[in-house]
Design a protein with these regions (language model features):
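A short, N-terminal "cap"/entry segment at the start of jelly-roll beta-barrel domains
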Residues: 4-99, 206
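Ligand-binding loop in jelly-roll beta-barrel domains
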Residues: 162, 171-191
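Conserved hydrophobic register position within alpha-solenoid helical repeats
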Residues: 222-228, 254-261, 272
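Charged, amphipathic alpha-helical linkers/stalks
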Residues: 195-237
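Amphipathic alpha-helical scaffolding segments comprising HEAT/armadillo-like alpha-solenoid repeats
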Residues: 207, 235-245, 267-272
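Conserved short histidine dyad/triad with adjacent acidic residue
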Residues: 59-61, 89-120, 170-172
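A short hydrophobic beta-strand segment most commonly corresponding to one strand
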Residues: 124, 134-136, 182-199
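Short acidic-glycine-tyrosine-enriched beta hairpin
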Residues: 118, 124, 140-171
Length: 272
C-alpha cells in the first residue's frame, strides 16, 4: 500500500545537499532508494528558507519563469539530475481560492477530484499548510487500459499531507483522488524518478471500479506512429514492429504493433 514513512527529524538540509545525496544513489531510483531518502526529504521540509529563496529568484527573473518545466502550472521545478530524478514543489489551492466562476475548470489543473495513478514511484512530504486530503486505493491487478475496463480496486485509507509528513506512492499500484485543502494554501515537495517508458497512467472511477481514460498522451502518439508504419513503411521496419509487439511494456502499444503487422505483414503477425 501507499506508505506513510515514520520519520521524526528536526535537522535541516539545503536543497543542493539533498540533490547531491540523491545523486549518489543508483542510476535508477527504486522504491528502496526512495525510502532511504525519506529522512533527507523531511529534513528539506524543515528548511523554511530554501523555498523562499527559490521563489524570490524566480520572481526576479519572471520573464524566464520555469521555461524548462514540462509539468503543469501548479508545479515548481526546484532541481534534480536530468534523466535520473527531479525535485519539485506542488502548490495546492484551497477551495476558496479556486476561480469562483470556473472552479470546475481549475480542478483538473491540480488533479482535484480526479482518481488517478502514477507511472512512477515517488516520495512526497508536506511543506506548508495542512495539505490536501486524499483517498487512496490499491489497484490489485493489471489493466489493459481500455475505457470502461473493470479493475480490482481495494480501499486503503483517507488521509492528509500536513507539514513534514512523508509518504511514498507506488507506480501503477496506488490510485488516489485529491480534494482541495479545506482552508490552507498548501505546498508539498516531491522526489521522483522519470516515468517508466511504456507504462501508462490512468484515470479511474472508484464507484464503478473502472478505468475511465488514459492520463498521458505519449503512448497514443506511439500507436499513431505504428499505424502510419503499417501504411507507409517498407519491409525494413517489420522486424522492429515485431519486437515492439512482443516486448514493449505497454499492452496498448503491443496491440497497436500487432494491428500494423496484421495489416501489412500478416505472416509476422502470427509470431507476435
Amino acid at each position: 500500500m501507499a506508505i506513510t514513512v515514520d520519520v521524526a527529524c528536526n535537522d535541516t538540509i539545503e536543497l543542493s545537499e539533498f540533490i547531491e545525496l540523491v545523486d549518489k544513489t543508483s542510476d535508477r531510483l527504486s522504491i528502496d532508494d526512495l525510502l532511504s531518502h525519506a529522512q533527507h526529504l523531511q529534513m528539506l521540509s524543515n528548511n523554511r528558507k530554501f523555498l523562499v529563496d527559490h521563489i524570490v529568484a524566480e520572481l526576479k527573473n519572471i520573464h524566464d519563469y520555469q521555461r524548462s518545466n514540462g509539468w503543469n502550472s501548479q508545479i515548481i521545478v526546484l532541481g534534480g539530475v536530468p534523466g535520473k530524478f527531479a525535485v519539485r514543489a506542488n502548490v495546492w489551492l484551497p477551495r476558496r481560492m479556486l476561480h469562483r466562476t470556473n472552479a470546475d475548470g481549475r480542478k483538473p489543473q491540480f488533479s482535484f477530484e480526479q482518481a488517478h495513478d502514477h507511472n512512477y514511484d515517488f516520495l512526497t512530504v508536506g511543506y506548508h499548510g495542512r495539505g490536501y486530503e486524499t483517498e487512496i486505493w490499491e489497484n490489485a491487478g493489471e489493466c489493459a487500459g481500455e475505457a470502461g475496463e473493470r479493475v480490482d480496486l481495494k480501499f486503503l485509507e483517507r488521509t492528509t499531507l500536513p507539514e513534514h509528513k512523508v509518504m511514498l506512492y507506488r507506480a501503477s499500484k496506488d490510485v488516489h483522488v485529491q480534494l482541495p485543502p479545506q482552508d490552507d494554501f498548501s505546498i508539498s515537495l516531491n522526489l521522483l524518478p522519470p516515468p517508466v517508458r511504456g507504462r501508462e497512467q490512468y484515470l479511474f472511477d472508484f464507484e464503478r471500479s473502472v478505468v475511465t481514460q488514459k492520463f498521458l498522451a505519449d503512448s497514443l502518439g506511439q500507436q499513431w506512429l505504428m499505424e502510419a508504419a503499417g501504411h507507409l513503411c517498407d519491409d525494413n521496419i517489420s522486424d522492429v514492429l515485431l519486437a515492439i509487439s512482443t516486448s514493449h511494456a505497454s499492452e496498448q502499444t503491443r496491440r497497436a504493433a500487432r494491428r500494423s503487422l496484421a495489416r501489412r505483414w500478416p505472416g509476422l503477425a502470427d509470431e507476435a
